[in-house]
Amino acid sequence: KKKFLFVSTKKQHGEIVETIAKDTGNYFVNFRWLGGMITNWNTVKNSISTLNNYENILNSDETVFTKKELSDIEKKKIRLEKTLGGIVEMKSIPDVLFIIDTNREHIAVLEAKKLGIPIIGIVDTNCDPDLIDYPIPANDDGVKSVQFILDNFKKVLSSDTNENNSGDGEKNNE
């Protein structure tokens, strides 16, 4: 099963992107794309590890930290959660990027191109469709249009998962 990374840092799409990613068992970036998020994966993994360490410290009953230090750790954790919260479970770079507004997320597009990761993108009239492997011409600003596209994409992902899990497995051998 391919792993998708849904990317949209527009406020109006943040919740939609998070919901579809969680519903389909994939990942998302809905706050800010950090430069090098996939091209410099080892550094990002270290940041995820730091986030997990902060959570362990804050959840621990035995603490050797002062209230001030715990407050600082809490602030750092919140900041890291905003940017990395949707990729904490990601173990390696994704198989496919699904990008809403390829103009705004141009750094994500360039990183995916550099690594040869296929891109599915909602491409508005102000975007270059030549940069995207699978462009979807649509309004990338409207919440309803993005919701419609993602709902249909979710159905496709769900039906693909159901087909792979059901049956006697002979379909895959053809």
What is each model feature region?
Residues 6, 97, 149:
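Residue-level signature of catalytic and energy-coupling elements of molecular machines
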Residues 104-136:
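Nucleotide-binding motor/catalytic cores of P-loop/tubulin-like NTPases across gene-expression machines
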Residues 20-73:
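Long, charge-dense
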Residues 155-174:
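Intrinsically disordered, compositionally biased charged tails
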Residues 129-161:
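Structured adenosyl-cofactor binding patch, chiefly the S-adenosyl-L-methionine
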Residues 79-84:
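Phosphate-interacting basic helix/loop segments used at nucleotide- and nucleic-acid interfaces
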